[in-house]
Regions:
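Amphipathic, small/basic residue-rich leader segments at the start of a protein or domain
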Residues: 1-126, 147-150, 570
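Glycine-rich phosphate/cofactor-binding loops in nucleotide/flavin-utilizing enzymes
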Residues: 3-25, 382-458, 548-571
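Internal helix-loop-helix
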Residues: 83-149, 154, 197-200, 333, ...
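A short core secondary-structure module
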Residues: 185, 189-232
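Flexible, small-/acidic-enriched active-site or ligand-binding loops
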Residues: 228-257
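A glycine-rich, basic-preceded beta-loop-alpha segment at the flavin cofactor/substrate interface
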Residues: 250-283, 300-316, 441, 449-450, ...
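C-terminal helix-coil-helix/basic helical segment that borders enzyme active sites and/or dimer interfaces
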Residues: 333-364, 368, 375-385, 508-555
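C-terminal amphipathic alpha-helical interaction region
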Residues: 445-571
Length: 571
């Protein structure tokens, strides 16, 4: 038999929320501000000794520019990282790992990514969606559990292979698992594409369609990459995060024991609450952690650049536009940190699926704004490559690499726009199941908290937040009605995207306001909330607009090579 990890019917919904979560403010009629006060206090930011050793190795023996230039993390470097325990950060202590909490693990990956986004990404994949993290905790006792535990203790590298040439997340994977004649094993056949860690992994989770006599089922196969028939067809290279091990994989008759395929009684093992929770945390490790690392680097580079530059004898930092750039970058970094702390650093982070779902795009989008401002700021000395600046003896920073890396992080694992729309769909599904009927627009009118710990401007931001929260349930109902069917969702993706972005901005605003009550940094909070308020006004205006331009008609004309349109556009 295949291994069944859950006896009950799985669900495509994320696990019910039990801990205090911002989701209750959006959909449940209870802002619960007093619960949020103090709820996201950070754990110690001091890195464990083992992580400090990894960082020292990266600082003294690794050239991130060479990794980016050559597009490869050299095998000797990976071997050394293995020896230093970099692939056992999340492994339980009884297996020789550090057993880091999700928040501490995030900080470790962020620190590594501040040296090299590619290496940080690689560690995020392994420690986030590798089989030891995403699958082992749910496995019953047996040979598969024993295998993963043994290889984890050895410091294996892992990943997860789902995407295929036909796309990502298809209901039925085209990679198949057929039983052998005696029924003791499965034979796997198919291709997987864009698989991070695939070329260097020891064990891989692989999504398959199991073709048993009882009918097809989706399964998760655990594959030893040393098995005959496993092949890395090509190493893939990207615009950013260059050097990340990523490949086109082929399984050509790979035979694995029958109990190395995991299924559920009904449904898809990819969509169980436990698996989805692991996936959401992994997205933060893989994308949000490097994004925050890049944003912090840009803030440091901006400060150093501004401190040494003068115009007409006046320090650059005395100019209004420069001050606004530095303040905006600082506020973005603090907001990202606040969202991460709320999502992972508070008690019961596993319950906060909403925060983790939106934190990925919150961090990557904020980091993209920081990088863009930094390019403009440092562009005053020339939009020049690091290599060119070194040639002429000018102070240099790897800003070009950061620019490419953040663009990659915004699309890795799913295009950013689509991620916002999908997050909104998950939110609407939750609303349909749990939201109280007839929630009034003034549901929060009598629940405004005392604001003695906030500055007058931030107190106004808090009141604005409550007003947005009051109107959000009605917006959910409206967008839900517009996108009720499959056809409507395809034709009305933009309202979903807008709803997702509104929710994301509200989450960030709440996180920084709650943080301001803890640490007293009112000015940074004000800068972020003011910028977020302008973004929210635009998003609400678009969502409420009675009609829109004919985007569909223009797109059809462009795709059909309409002669008149082509002539107008010079195509």
């Amino acid at each position: 038999m295949t291994v069944q990890v859950f006896a009950e019917r799985p669900t495509t919904q994320v696990a019910p929320t039990f801990a205090p979560t911002f989701l209750t403010a959006l959909t449940g009629g209870d802002p619960a501000w007093d619960v949020r006060r103090g709820a996201s206090a950070p754990e110690s930011v001091e890195q464990p000794t083992e992580v400090v050793r990894i960082l020292a190795f990266l600082d003294t023996e690794v050239d991130p520019d060479a990794v980016d230039r050559e597009g490869e993390i050299p095998p000797f470097l990976i071997a050394r990282l293995r020896d230093l325990g970099a692939f056992r950060l999340a492994t339980s202590q009884d297996l020789g790992g550090l057993g880091l909490t999700p928040y501490t693990l995030f900080r470790a990956v962020e620190a590594v990514a501040s040296r090299s986004a590619a290496i940080g990404f690689m560690l995020g994949v392994h420690n986030g969606i590798g089989v030891a993290t995403s699958l082992l905790p749910t496995l019953p006792h047996g040979s598969l559990r024993d295998l993963i535990r043994r290889r984890s203790a050895e410091g294996m590298i892992s990943g997860f292979a789902d995407t295929e040439p036909a796309g990502q997340g298809n209901r039925w994977p085209r990679t198949t698992a057929d039983p052998t004649p005696d029924g003791s094993a499965y034979v796997l056949k198919g291709d997987k594409l864009f698989i991070s860690n695939g070329p260097v992994a020891d064990l891989l989770g692989v999504t398959v369609t199991v073709r048993d006599e009882d009918g097809p089922r989706v399964g998760l196969a655990v594959v030893d990459t040393r098995s005959p028939g496993f092949e890395v067809r090509a190493d893939l290279e990207y615009l950013g995060v260059r050097g990340l091990p990523n490949g086109w994989l082929r399984l050509k008759g790979v035979t694995i024991p029958r109990d190395h395929v995991v299924t559920v009684a009904q449904g898809d093992p990819r969509h169980t609450p436990e698996r989805m929770s692991a996936y959401l945390t992994a997205r933060m490790l893989i994308q949000a952690a490097p994004a925050l690392a890049i944003a912090r680097n840009c803030l440091r580079w901006s400060r150093e650049f501004t401190a040494r530059r003068r115009v007409d004898g006046i320090g650059l930092g005395e100019y209004d536009l420069i001050q606004r750039t530095l303040a905006a970058n600082a506020a973005e970094v603090r907001a990202m940190d606040a969202v991460v702390r709320w999502s992972l650093g508070a008690p019961a982070p596993g319950d906060r699926w909403f925060e983790r779902m939106f934190a990925r795009n919150f961090c990557t989008e904020a980091a993209a704004r920081v990088v863009d401002r930094t390019v403009s700021l440092l562009g005053g000395e020339g939009v020049e490559t690091d290599r060119s600046k070194r040639r002429r003896g000018a102070p240099s920073v790897p800003l070009e690499r950061a620019f490419r890396d953040i663009r990659m992080l915004r699309t890795a694992g799913g295009v950013d726009d689509l991620a916002d729309a999908q997050a909104a769909q998950a939110l609407l599904a939750h609303v349909a199941d749990t939201a109280p009927a007839g929630l009034a627009a003034d549901a929060f009118a009598d629940t405004l908290p005392a604001t003695e710990n906030l500055s007058p401007r931030n107190a106004r931001h808090l009141r604005d937040l409550y007003e947005d929260l009051a109107r959000f349930p009605a917006a959910c109902r409206d967008v839900g009605a517009r996108t009720a069917g499959e056809r409507e969702r395809r034709a009305q993706q933009y309202p979903l995207l807008l709803l997702g972005r509104i929710a994301r901005e509200l989450l960030g605003t709440a996180a920084v306001l709650a943080t301001a009550e803890q640490d007293g940094h009112q000015r940074l909070t004000d800068v972020h909330c003011t910028a977020a308020r302008f973004r929210l006004r635009d998003l609400w205006a678009q969502l409420d607009a009675p009609d829109h331009p004919d985007h569909a008609g223009i797109a059809r004309a462009v795709l059909s090579r309409d002669r008149h349109v082509d002539d107008l556009l010079g195509l």
